[in-house]
């Protein structure tokens, strides 16, 4: 509430600036503007809860004071009543004072907004709200970035822990693998040592000590190298000849076996040393295929053991694997060729005596040379026949492929022909009733034209009438083919005959009806005269 000035109050302060009359129950707004209660009710409450002079919003103040009934400035109202009781009484009774117009003083100038002032206020408010919103978004973005960085740091720490754990597991696994490899290598060494220490089974021929030492050294030291770089057949033959030279005087040629369990005897077929020195390249080493099979089986077992050992120790490479595969394929081819040679030789020698003394086995140098040449020729013939066999096999494969393709095409053509035949049968079964087709629908001719034709051309008496069967179908005669359709001309003539007979029947019936029909028409005088004249 505004402070009331001391007495006496000037007349200008007791006049309402809106109605220009004395203040009746004055209301002092928070902006220090005063107006009477009726003007406040009309302008502020009904129009807008703002001051009519400065446009300050007074909605909260008005609701609060109207609730407590303290809108009227009672102190100012009491002062005005004491100073101007007559004017207050007139205003309360509704009478207008005459002397108010003469005593008008200067009213406060209404305050108006400058051009663009409201727009500036609006833009300032909008910019303020926008700045607050951007500041809030920036704060939220910073908080989210901090949270994301925290999560990333936690994930990175977890990944590091996981990587360390996996690395430890890998290291432990490697250690375990190394221990296992050491154990396996120790077992392999023990097994090799036991194999070398085991004496061979009782046999007819005994190998000399020097050959045993050579074999044990070769087995212990060159297990893997023997498979990685296989020896040619000539070297094997020379090695076998040297072994036979160091053996007993019986002259038997002994092949080195991996297991040394069975050492079969061979017939003395080795040539003399001079011939071997001269033809070291050409002569093959005599051997038995069974021994070779046993040797290859033992070699394959040692191969697998050596490969496992290399894999466990981590020294097995791609080049070694390729060499092993190549050596295996070469050994297999060699085994097949040698088995064929041996079969041919055994077939040729089956008619000769199997056992002879050592002295009778040796032939002359010329005969030996001829036998060596014959063996060489056999080898060459086998080597020449092998590509021929491969060519024939390729031709057979091509012929089989061509035959298979031809049969496949014939089956495809047969299925296609069956499909076409089905479609053709379906088309033949369907009856075409379209215009211009042989089975088209016959249109009814006009009745007047038919009657004229019937009257112009009377039917002959000897014409054969169509006979109807039980199904109602007309038959002009017997036809052997039941499915044969009647011709178009016959069907037209039969329809004409039926129509002409119907017309004659209708004419006769109409004449009879005219005779029998009673005359409902009243007779005229002329009819009566005609009847009387007729009688």
From Swiss-Prot:
Cystine pairings recorded for this chain: none
UniProt similarity note: Belongs to the RNF168 family.
Annotated metabolic or biological route of this protein: Protein modification; protein ubiquitination
InterPro entries, per database record: RNF168 (IPR034725), RNF168/RNF169_E3_ubiq-ligase (IPR051657), Znf_C3HC4_RING-type (IPR018957), Znf_RING (IPR001841), Znf_RING/FYVE/PHD (IPR013083)
GO CC list: nucleus; site of double-strand break; ubiquitin ligase complex
Bias (Basic and acidic residues) ranges: 429-443
Compartment(s) where it occurs, according to its Swiss-Prot or TrEMBL record: Nucleus
Catalytic activity of the protein: S-ubiquitinyl-[E2 ubiquitin-conjugating enzyme]-L-cysteine + [acceptor protein]-L-lysine = [E2 ubiquitin-conjugating enzyme]-L-cysteine + N(6)-ubiquitinyl-[acceptor protein]-L-lysine
Short sequence motif named UMI motif, residue ranges: 145-153
Primary location group: nucleus
SMART domains reported in the protein's UniProt record: RING
One Pfam family per UniProt: zf-C3HC4
One biological process term in Gene Ontology: isotype switching
Full protein name: E3 ubiquitin-protein ligase rnf168
SUPFAM superfamilies (UniProt xref): RING/U-box
The organism of origin for this protein: Xenopus tropicalis
Residues in RING-type zinc fingers: 16-55
Lineage, uppermost ranks: Eukaryota, Metazoa, Chordata, Craniata, Vertebrata
Residue numbers covered by motif MIU motif 2: 406-429
Motif stretch (LR motif 1): 112-130
Name of the gene: rnf168
């Amino acid at each position: 509430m505004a402070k009331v000035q001391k007495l006496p109050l000037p007349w200008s302060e007791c006049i309402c600036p809106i109605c220009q009359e004395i203040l009746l129950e004055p209301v002092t707004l928070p902006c220090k503007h005063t107006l009477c209660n009726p003007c406040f009710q009309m302008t502020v409450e009904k129009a807008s809860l703002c001051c009519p002079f400065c446009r300050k919003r007074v909605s909260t103040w008005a609701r609060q004071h109207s609730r407590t009934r303290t809108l009227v400035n009672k102190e100012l109202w009491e002062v005005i009543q004491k100073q101007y009781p007559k004017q207050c009484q007139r205003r309360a009774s509704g009478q207008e004072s005459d002397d108010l117009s003469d005593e008008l003083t200067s009213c406060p100038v209404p305050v108006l907004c400058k051009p663009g002032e409201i727009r500036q206020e609006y833009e300032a408010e909008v910019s303020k709200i926008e700045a607050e919103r951007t500041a809030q978004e920036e704060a939220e973005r910073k908080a989210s970035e901090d949270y994301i960085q925290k999560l990333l740091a936690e994930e990175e720490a977890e990944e590091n822990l996981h990587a360390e754990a996996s690395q430890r597991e890998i290291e432990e696994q490697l250690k375990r693998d190394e221990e296992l490899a050491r154990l396996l290598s120790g077992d392999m060494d023990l097994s090799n040592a036991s194999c070398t220490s085991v004496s061979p089974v009782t046999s007819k021929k005994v190998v000399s000590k020097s050959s045993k030492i050579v074999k044990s050294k070769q087995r212990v030291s060159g297990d893997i190298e023997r498979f990685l770089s296989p020896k040619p057949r000539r070297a094997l033959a020379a090695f076998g000849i040297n072994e036979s030279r160091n053996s007993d005087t019986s002259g038997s040629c002994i092949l080195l076996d991996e297991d040394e369990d069975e050492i079969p005897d061979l017939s003395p077929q080795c040539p003399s040393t001079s011939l071997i020195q001269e033809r070291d390249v050409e002569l093959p080493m005599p051997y038995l295929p069974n021994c070779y099979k046993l040797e290859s089986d033992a070699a394959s077992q040692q191969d697998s053991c050596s490969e496992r050992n290399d894999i466990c120790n981590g020294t097995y490479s791609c080049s070694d694997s390729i060499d092993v595969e190549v050596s295996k394929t070469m050994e297999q081819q060699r085994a097949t060729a040698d088995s064929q040679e041996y079969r041919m030789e055994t077939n040729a020698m089956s008619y000769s005596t199997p056992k002879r003394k050592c002295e009778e086995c040796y032939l002359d140098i010329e005969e030996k040379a001829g036998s060596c040449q014959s063996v060489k020729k056999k080898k060459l013939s086998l080597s020449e026949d092998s590509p021929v066999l491969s060519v024939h096999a390729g031709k057979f494969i091509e012929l089989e492929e061509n035959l298979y393709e031809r049969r496949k095409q014939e089956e495809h053509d047969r299925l296609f022909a069956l499909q076409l035949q089905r479609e053709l049968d379906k088309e033949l079964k369907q009856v075409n009733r379209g215009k211009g087709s042989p089975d088209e629908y016959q249109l009814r001719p006009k009745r007047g034209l038919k009657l004229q034709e019937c009257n112009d051309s009377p039917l002959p008496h000897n014409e054969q009438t169509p006979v109807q069967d039980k199904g109602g179908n007309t038959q002009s005669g017997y036809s052997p083919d039941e499915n044969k359709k009647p011709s178009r001309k016959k069907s037209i003539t039969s329809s004409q005959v039926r129509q002409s007979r119907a017309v004659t029947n209708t004419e006769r019936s109409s004449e009879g009806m005219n005779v029998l029909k009673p005359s409902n028409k009243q007779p005229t005088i002329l009819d009566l005269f005609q009847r009387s004249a007729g009688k």
